[in-house]
From Swiss-Prot:
<comment type="similarity">
    <text>Belongs to the UPF0297 family.</text>
</comment>
<dbReference type="InterPro" id="IPR009309">
    <property type="entry name" value="IreB"/>
</dbReference>
<dbReference type="Pfam" id="PF06135">
    <property type="entry name" value="IreB"/>
</dbReference>
<protein>
    <recommendedName>
        <fullName>UPF0297 protein Csac_1773</fullName>
    </recommendedName>
</protein>
Length: 84
C-alpha cells in the first residue's frame, strides 16, 4: 500500500470548458422550468443523465465532461470565494 498523497491536476482549459458546459446546461434546464441546481445535483450524485433535459441538446453536452471534472470546478469555486 502506498501512503503517498496522489496529486490531481486540473488545467485552465478544462476549467473554462466546465464553466461553458454548466452554463449551457443550466440555461436549458431553466428554460424547461426545472430547478437547475436540483437536477444537476441529481446527475452529479447518481450519474444518471436523465436528470438533464434533452432541450438544446443539454444531455449530450453535459456528457462531454466527466462528473469529477464538474465537481472539481464547483469545489474550487466554492473554496476561492468562501475560504481563501
Amino acid at each position: 500500500m502506498n501512503d503517498k498523497t496522489q496529486h490531481f491536476s486540473f488545467d485552465d482549459a478544462m476549467e473554462k470548458k466546465v464553466k461553458e458546459i454548466l452554463s449551457e446546461v443550466y440555461s436549458a434546464l431553466k428554460e424547461k422550468g426545472y430547478n437547475p441546481i436540483a437536477q444537476l445535483v441529481g446527475y452529479l450524485i447518481s450519474g444518471d443523465p436523465t436528470y438533464i433535459t434533452n432541450h438544446k441538446n443539454a444531455r449530450s453536452i453535459i456528457r462531454r465532461i466527466e462528473r469529477d471534472e464538474i465537481l472539481e470546478e464547483i469545489v474550487k469555486f466554492y473554496i476561492d470565494h468562501n475560504i481563501e
